Amino acid sequence: MERFGRLLRVNLSTGSITQEEISPSWIEMFIGGSALAARLLWERLRPDLDPLSPESPLLFITGPLTGTAGPAVGRFTVCARSPATGLWGESNCGGFWGPELRFAGYDALWIEGRAPEPVYLWIHNGRAEIRPASHLWGQDPYAVQAIVREEVRDPLARVAAIGIAGENQVPFALILCDHGRVAGRTGMGAVMGSKNLKAIAVRGTQPLPIARPETFQALRAQANRALREDNLTRVFRETGTAGAAEYFDLLGSMPKRYYGQGAWEGASKISGAAMAETILSGVSACHACVIACGRVVTIPEGPYARTKAKGPEYETIAAFGPNLLNDDLQAITHLGDLCDRYGLDSISMGNVLGLAYLLFEQGRITERETGGLSLRWGDIRPVEILIAQTARREGFGALLAHGARGLGRAFGAEDLAVEVKGLEVPYHDPRGVAGIALSYATSPRGACHNQSDFFMVELGQSSEELGIPYLDRHQVEGKARYVAIHQNWRTACNSLVLCYFANVAPSVALALLNAAMGMGVGSAHDAASGGAGLAIETGDQQPSGCHAGRRPVAQAAPGAPGRWRSGRLRSGSGDHAAGILRGSGVGSCDRPAHAGNPPAVGAGVCPGGEPVTAIGVPSRRTADGSGSA
């Protein structure tokens, strides 16, 4: 097996830095990325562990394809106990930082402890050091990148940094690197801030060995040709993820007015096409990617003028656009940039703001609580103030910083908060694409459109090799099995670590892995590794217990497209709400802690709280691969 498995362990309390090798048997079973991270963290994530305590580990991890010349392999994963949910925390990020960590000689970075003063890490070609960062505290991540590169005297150093929100341990704080690529979900920036760790700079020139280079090169060329010819990747290349806005609006899957409205006339003003026609000035790509879905924009004049900024992704557009009934693309760009600079996940920030606007409309929140701010749909003038307050935990922002569940609880409206297991729901409404409802309910980290982007399958993305047939997006019956299969496959993708946008066929992905590592695994192993990783990630939530919400939303919103589904979701013998979020019982779990061992492959939590075993997982091995379950 070619080199993969070098872990750098840093204890910020003691200042110790050591290197170690990850067990080859674990790599064989879990590959890398989030599944391997789940196995590495399993013994350390005790049910009573405070996610923001010095003892809580933070793990940055790559996959065996990261940094190679393979298709769209620039991503890495950050994992820890989530301060947002208290459960499994995982965030996936693109750019160049992950490949650079491997070039520097490491495949994973384990951080524990808490530095007495702010610090940053400098990792370069097999060496690592802890440096003072008090002068960086309070700086935004882009400024930190520039300062750190100057200090390490290397303009090519890649820097991952947190903003003020991470410093203040806001539960949905992000980590930003490169040209605005972010590890946004589950509050990994807060965990980093709790350790007084402002940034991690990496630089390396070490080559990555490929076991069978000629085979790998041929597979790479084949995959990239398919990418260039694929219609979906062509859309991403031409309009970015924002190009999905009008289409999702047409399907009724882009939420408006905090999931309370179906029809809206502003989608065409904030779409990827509108961006291309008005403020687009360039594109950006991650390592080894021919898609280049990133947008670069210029706003020449007006209150949001800037010479160069990251164009907003679909989630940011939906968060600060239709969610608040705002059709000003320049304002959305500005608010998304503010979230990046303050270090806040725009999905969660937009969600909690939407709830605040709704509660203001209902009279549960008044100007007395908001500090004189009037929260009216379509008026986004207060949003800039509230983003800053949230990052600083000041004023009304101190309440918003507790997330949607916390805000709802504070005003006796927890049933109105659109979240799953404490994680705010992203902007893909299950009433327009039914399968994502079950994915939200069963995702280990809470509401997640990346644990399984099943809505893409429902919209026609090829999944023939997985045995998933064409499924009507409104169909509910018989869909659970295919959601489970897709979740396992996406967990395997997160182990490699592959960008979903490439939509690499499973056979090609496995062939690339075998060529890179000199392995000989087949599709059954791939499905098993995905199921095993998902089982451990899900198992992390079981000791803590996950409880259901009370907003099933079993009816379509006013003005929704004609076929927008209402009613209830049936799965197995249970009858569960096909609503916006957890529904009446979806995702609940009150089982006692497991006694020392990870759950079996395929074991999970059913929407009603009963054990789910091996749904769509063709393996019965235990999570550590030791034998039959």
Set out the residue ranges of the language-model regions:
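Intrinsically disordered, low-complexity segments enriched in small residues
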Residues: M1-N92, F96-P618
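Compositionally biased, low-complexity flexible segments
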Residues: P618-A629
